[in-house]
């Protein structure tokens, strides 16, 4: 059986260990490649098994010494191997009885605290039934990282995973953001409630004012007396005893007011105009009026006017040749011109003078008739 032994690397030392059932260590984050080989007693000869571990050296951290742990039961032929996240396949060789396993060395934990997976989550069991010189190799897939969910302060359940960014700071910022969003709503709600209350008060005031106005108008209508006197006057003046419908007070006012007010106004105006004219006419007007006789046409007065003007003009010629002083001649000429102007005024006012003369004559006749009737 000496020819069946495998060559062992220089840096590895075989150790024989009796394995008991103990809890496994969590080495799921370690990048390792495991190669194990076991030999059993056959035909009374003892065969030793060697284990080799190869670890990649990460650049940012010092050289870690990751470990691999394998457990087997004495009576069973199963070997349980913890999967590693590396892409390097692990070769496993097993025999039937004794297994030699490398000691468990605590690996140095890397600085990547972003994700910490749960304990004993990605473990797999591999059954290997190897004969004397045969080995079974299995390619272990890379486990997917599990992210811890962000929990609020109120949750009291124990955390199996944690994230550095998912601590109380996130909870504080979460609460602060919610508080900041909720705070500006309160003044808006108060403002809206104030607006609604002010609108309700305004509508109530308007309704109360309108109702008060309506009540006042109704009271005034009830208090106002009905104009019964006007209806009685209209009924008494009529000779027929037929009942007449009572007219509304508005209609009676419209009919009566213009008659009472319109009648004295034009009379006063006419009297004022006549008085003003008499004052302006003066003495000359009274003289011209005295010259007119009623019933004489105006054509006669015009003919007389033309004749008088002609006489005055011809009378100036002998004055010019008589040799009188210039002072006298100018005086005579002024008299002639004055007479001519007065005659023209008289002719222009003839129709007016005739009308006034006729009115006076009629009024005189009326007075005389009234005196005779009284006598």
Curated annotation (Swiss-Prot):
Keyword annotations from UniProtKB, A to Z: Membrane, Transmembrane, Transmembrane helix
Comp. bias intervals (Basic residues): 1-12, 363-375
Subcellular location field: Membrane
Protein's organism: Dictyostelium discoideum
Any one of the GO BP annotations: vacuolar proton-transporting V-type ATPase complex assembly
Keyword Transmembrane recorded: yes
Ranges where the record places region Disordered: 1-76, 119-274, 355-375
Compositional bias segments (type: Basic and acidic residues): 175-185, 256-274
Topology class, membrane: Multi-pass membrane protein
PANTHER family in UniProt: V-TYPE ATPASE ASSEMBLY FACTOR PKR1
Cellular component GO terms, alphabetical: endoplasmic reticulum membrane
Name of the protein this chain belongs to: Uncharacterized transmembrane protein DDB_G0282483
Biased composition (Polar residues): 26-39
């Amino acid at each position: 059986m000496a020819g069946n032994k495998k060559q062992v690397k220089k840096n590895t030392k075989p150790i024989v260990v009796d394995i008991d059932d103990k809890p496994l260590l969590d080495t799921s984050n370690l990048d390792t490649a495991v190669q194990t080989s076991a030999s059993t007693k056959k035909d009374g000869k003892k065969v030793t098994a060697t284990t080799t571990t190869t670890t990649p050296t990460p650049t940012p951290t010092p050289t870690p010494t990751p470990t691999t742990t394998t457990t087997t039961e004495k009576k069973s032929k199963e070997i349980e191997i913890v999967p590693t996240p590396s892409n390097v396949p692990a070769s496993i060789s097993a025999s039937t009885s004794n297994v030699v396993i490398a000691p468990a060395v605590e690996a140095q934990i890397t600085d990547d605290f972003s994700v910490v997976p749960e304990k004993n989550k990605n473990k797999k069991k591999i059954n290997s039934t190897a004969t004397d010189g045969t080995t079974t190799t299995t390619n272990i897939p890379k486990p997917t990282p599990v992210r811890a969910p962000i929990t609020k302060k109120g949750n009291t359940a124990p955390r199996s995973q944690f994230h550095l960014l998912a601590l109380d700071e996130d909870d504080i910022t979460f609460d602060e953001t919610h508080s900041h969003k909720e705070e500006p709503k309160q003044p808006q709600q108060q403002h809206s409630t104030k607006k609604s209350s002010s609108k309700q008060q305004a509508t109530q005031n308007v309704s109360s004012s309108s109702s008060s106005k309506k009540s006042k108008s109704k009271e005034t209508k009830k208090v106002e007396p009905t104009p019964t006197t006007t209806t009685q006057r209209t009924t008494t003046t009529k000779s027929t005893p037929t009942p007449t419908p009572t007219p509304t007070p508005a209609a009676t006012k419209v009919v009566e007011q213009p008659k009472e007010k319109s009648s004295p106004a034009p009379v006063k105006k006419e009297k004022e105009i006549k008085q003003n004219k008499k004052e302006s006419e003066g003495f000359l007007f009274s003289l011209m009026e005295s010259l007119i006789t009623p019933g004489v046409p105006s054509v006669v007065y015009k003919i007389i006017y033309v004749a008088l003007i002609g006489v005055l003009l011809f009378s100036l010629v002998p004055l010019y040749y008589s040799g009188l002083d210039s002072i006298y001649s100018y005086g005579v000429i002024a008299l002639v011109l004055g007479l001519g102007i007065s005659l023209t005024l008289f002719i222009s006012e003839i129709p007016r003078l005739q009308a006034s003369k006729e009115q006076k004559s009629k009024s005189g006749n009326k007075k005389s008739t009234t005196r005779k009737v009284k006598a």
